[in-house]
Amino acid sequence: MSGYTGNNYSRYSSTPPRQRGGYHHARRSRGGAGGSYYRGGNASYGARYNSDYEQPPQEGDLRQTGAYYRNGYTDTRPYYSANSRHYQAQPSPRYNNGTNSYHLPQRGNSQDTNGRTTSASQEDNDEKRVKSRYRNMQADHPRQQPMSVGSTSSRNGSSGNSSTSSTSNGLPPPPSVSSITNNRSYHSSAYPYSSSHTYNNYHHRETPPPPPSNGYYAKGYPVHVPENRSNSDGSSSSVVKKKRILDMKDSPFIYLTDFDKNVKKTNNTESECEKAREVFKESDSIDSALEELNLKINSNELELRLLNNQCDKHALNIQLTQEKLDSLLLMQ
């Protein structure tokens, strides 16, 4: 970060350290020794950085933390692990010497950070330079709102000259779509989100697959029984009932054995069916007689068990009386 605004917060956060989970910096320097922990004093900051803590944000200078933190960018913190160190926002000469600075694309001649004049022919060279870390701020944070107009102020360089911005609110034009998609952001591997990350995919649900067809289920009956329909003649529209050869009062064995279907349709069909009826009637009578005999056998078996139990009871009574007699004989 090039500007030291005095908030003494971490590099990417606008929230004070005491409000971020109770985290405290190891050594927080105040007053004229601002930045002495990491750099070693106020002397190396240059003419622009003095002990004034409330410097106004420089016009068009996106490297200043105050320009973002004082205008609505309240959640620019990337993901930090639990034990990672939060370094203070310290200015460094590699962000001040102009090699890594963000130059405003202007039509006419203007002065950059160090007072050098740049013309319109140098715009291509400016694009080829190393992009600042906040060049793709909108790509890293697509939900953030643009900065307000109130952040514009006069910019005093080291030579005392002032430069005016090409836009009304003192900000450069937003990066193009090609620069967002083609250029890799500064947080290439450390930042958890990609440059084209959107935040509505949390509740994203894929469409369920279509239900399987009826032929998918090999076992079981289909839901709709297929009907064979032929539109060749009009008589097929009416349901044709198949007339059974045998009546329902006949023996069920006829239908279980499909005897009525196996009978050949000849002139003596009725005689064959009559013979089959007589045979099945005889078999039914025989089955009923067998059932009666089976019932008699079961009843006789129960009677035998009862008699056996009675015999056991009588045997116990005889043994008891014999013991009583023996006891009486011993007493005499």
Swiss-Prot record:
Keywords: Activator, Chromatin regulator, Coiled coil, Methylation, Nucleus, Transcription, Transcription regulation. Residues 284-328 form a coiled coil. It comes from the Eukaryota. Residues 21-30 have a biased composition (Basic residues). Residues 1-17, 81-122 have a biased composition (Polar residues). Its main location: nucleus. It is found in: Nucleus. Residues 39-49, 148-170, 185-199 have a biased composition (Low complexity). InterPro entries: Tscrpt_reg_Lge1. GO terms for biological process: chromatin organization; premeiotic DNA replication; regulation of cell size. GO terms for cellular component: nucleus. GO terms for molecular function: molecular condensate scaffold activity. The modification Omega-N-methylarginine is found at residues 30, 39. Residues 1-240 are annotated as: Disordered. Required to activate transcription of PDR3, a gene involved in retrograde regulation of multidrug resistance, a phenomenon that takes place in cells that have lost their mitochondrial genome. Also required for ubiquitination of histone H2B to form H2BK123ub1. H2BK123ub1 gives a specific tag for epigenetic transcriptional activation, telomeric silencing, and is also a prerequisite for H3K4me and H3K79me formation. Its precise role in H2BK123ub1 formation however is unclear and is independent of retrograde regulation of multidrug resistance function. Probably interacts with BRE1. Present with 2060 molecules/cell in log phase SD medium. This is Transcriptional regulatory protein LGE1. The lineage of its organism: Eukaryota, Fungi, Dikarya, Ascomycota, Saccharomycotina.
